[in-house]
Amino acid sequence: ELFFRTKALPITVEDEVWIGGGSIVLAGVTIGRGSVIGAGSVVTKSIPANCVAVGNPCKVIKWLKPKYKIRPLEEEDILEIRELFRNTVLTVNSKDYTKEEVEDWASCGDSVEHWKELLAKNDYIGALDGQGRIVGFSSMNTEGYLHSMFVHKDWQGKGVATLLLSEVEKMARGYGVHKISVEVSITARPFFEKRGYKVVKEQRARANRLYLTNYVMEKTL
């Protein structure tokens, strides 16, 4: 038996969720896609996607490894990756940059024509979830410059960026490149450092109107 205590707020249960018998889900809670709720749990706050959660109150005890599909991105993907880019910058990067800075940075992706130019100059790949939605993307050019790496705010810490980085590093080797260079944000620096990238210099790089702090990093393959 399963109890939903809704009061005035809705409960959202996303696709491929399993909820054990005797569980109680309180008002306003969202249970993310692919998650498992243990029997008899009391879900008092939202549960993220792809995890196992149990207890009273219900807590995440294990992350489930989601399966992603990698494919090249084309012009028809522009609207989706533009929205992902904007939302990621405004949310994920806001912990390291001011509101004015992230808004200026996000505005760099407003132009569809600019995205077309980027797709023409770089090889873009996307990571897709089980529903075919793009949850992250990255790009590399034939000279070994890693141009972009962005992961949807709801898919942070779930292996998306690690998979994308592995794929673009394979691309670089295929180009015959022995060193990758990349400009990374304050937010992304720890991720790249853990994967063997070294800071060459700190700089102030122009976004749209403003100059933001980032780092030139390199890795020898």
Region spans (language model):
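Flexible, glycine/small-residue-enriched loop-and-beta-strand segment within the central core
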Residues: E1-A27, K65
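Residue-level recognition of the GNAT/N-acetyltransferase active site
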Residues: E14, L26, H152, E183-S185
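Conserved N-terminal entry element of GNAT/NAT acetyltransferase domains
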Residues: K65-L79
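Acetyl-CoA-dependent GNAT
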Residues: P72-E75, E83-D154, L165-E167, M171, ...
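Conserved catalytic-core motifs of GNAT/GCN5-like acyltransferases
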Residues: S181-E183, K198-V216
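Conserved active-site tyrosine of GNAT-family acetyltransferases
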Residues: F192-E193, Y197
